[in-house]
Regions:
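Ligand-binding loop in jelly-roll beta-barrel domains
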Residues: 77-100, 110
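Short hydrophobic/aromatic patch on the recognition helix
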Residues: 69, 223-228, 272-273, 277
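Generic protein-terminus/edge-of-domain signal
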Residues: 1-71, 77-78, 86, 112-113, ...
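Amphipathic alpha-helical segments enriched in hydrophobic/aromatic residues interleaved with Lys/Arg
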Residues: 110-164, 198
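Terminal helix-turn-helix DNA-binding modules in bacterial transcription factors
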Residues: 197-198, 202, 207-214, 219, ...
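Hydrophobic recognition helices of helix-based DNA-binding modules
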Residues: 169-172, 176, 200, 228, ...
Length: 293
């Protein structure tokens, strides 16, 4: 299993329906062939609660090493990915919802003052609720209540859910940084990042270079490189190598020879593949295969 996206890495899964765009689902990383879900984004806000085991989760330029009980708020339209840590499975509950459930309709006072400034703030990809601040426990308890209501309340369900979403939002808002106001510039930059990630996803098995990627975006190589590092906090080359390693895991799980895996995932040879794999995963491909078996 893997998350299905379009050519721009937008997730195609429906989160609820048009009448009530809200979804709560129990997930576990071992359901994914690679023990991870790949980079994707969606226009809905997502909040995760880890219920068992750890997870390494990255969103745009930030990486979190989450543990059981942690909650992660992922803003709308933010690229994110998650993977196992130390081969441990992770169970988590995911809540995704359309921001309109918070503000009624675009143009309203609630939407303009309290919702739009957050979802258009591209410098705010995530908030980690991990008990490091006094308000975190209240947020976590209310989020658990939301999950329970969504799963067990047949009467007035939509009203009960909306009420708790708004209470969560009211609790979260005072602790968020003020948006810079450079909405159009930031939106354009992250649209380019999504195009870069999509290009890598579609071509990682080939010999692609910075020149190829920058040409795809109609940017000069230096600007393309600076843009990616600024927005993702990693060089484009390192990101490409790490992505190729993640994609190679499904072949490792199928017991394919390392030479064939290297060829299928864009590495020049099996030795280079093994070297990069060790840097990314902390063990060789063969050691990884033994630990997974």
């Amino acid at each position: 299993m893997q998350i299905v996206t379009d050519k721009h890495q937008k997730e195609l899964k429906k989160h609820g329906n048009e009448a009530f765009p809200f979804l709560v689902s129990g997930e576990r990383l071992s359901r994914y062939e690679t023990g991870s879900f790949w980079w994707h984004w969606h226009p809905e806000i997502e909040i995760l609660l880890l219920t068992d085991g750890p997870m390494c989760c990255s969103a745009n330029d930030r990486t979190f090493h989450l543990k059981e009980g942690d909650v992660l708020f992922i803003n709308a339209n933010v690229l994110h990915t998650g993977s196992m840590e130390n081969f441990q499975d992770c169970r988590y509950t995911s809540v995704t919802f359309d921001p309109r459930l918070l503000g009624g309709f675009p143009g309203s006072a609630v939407w303009t003052k309290y919702v739009e400034p957050v979802i258009r703030n591209f410098s705010l990809p995530t908030v980690c609720i991990d008990s490091s601040e006094n308000w975190h426990e209240e947020f976590r308890a209310l989020f658990r209540e939301l999950i329970s209501v969504a799963q067990n309340t047949p009467d007035y369900r939509e009203l009960e859910i909306t009420l708790r979403l708004q209470r969560l939002w009211l609790l979260l808002l005072p602790h968020l940084p003020v948006a810079s106001g450079e909405y159009s510039r930031n939106a354009a930059e992250y649209e380019r990042i999504r195009r870069i990630v999509a290009y890598i996803e579609q071509n990682y098995m080939e010999k692609i270079s910075l020149k190829d990627i920058s040409a795809h975006l109609h940017l000069c190589e230096s600007e393309c490189s600076r843009l990616f590092r600024r927005c993702m906090n990693v060089s484009l080359n390192v990101f490409l190598q790490e992505y190729r390693v993640e994609r190679s895991l499904e072949y490792l799980n199928k017991r394919e020879p390392l030479t064939e895996i290297a060829a299928k995932t864009g590495f020049s040879d099996s030795n280079y593949y093994s070297k990069v794999f060790r840097r990314v995963k902390g063990c060789s491909p063969r050691e990884y295969r033994r630990k997974k078996s």
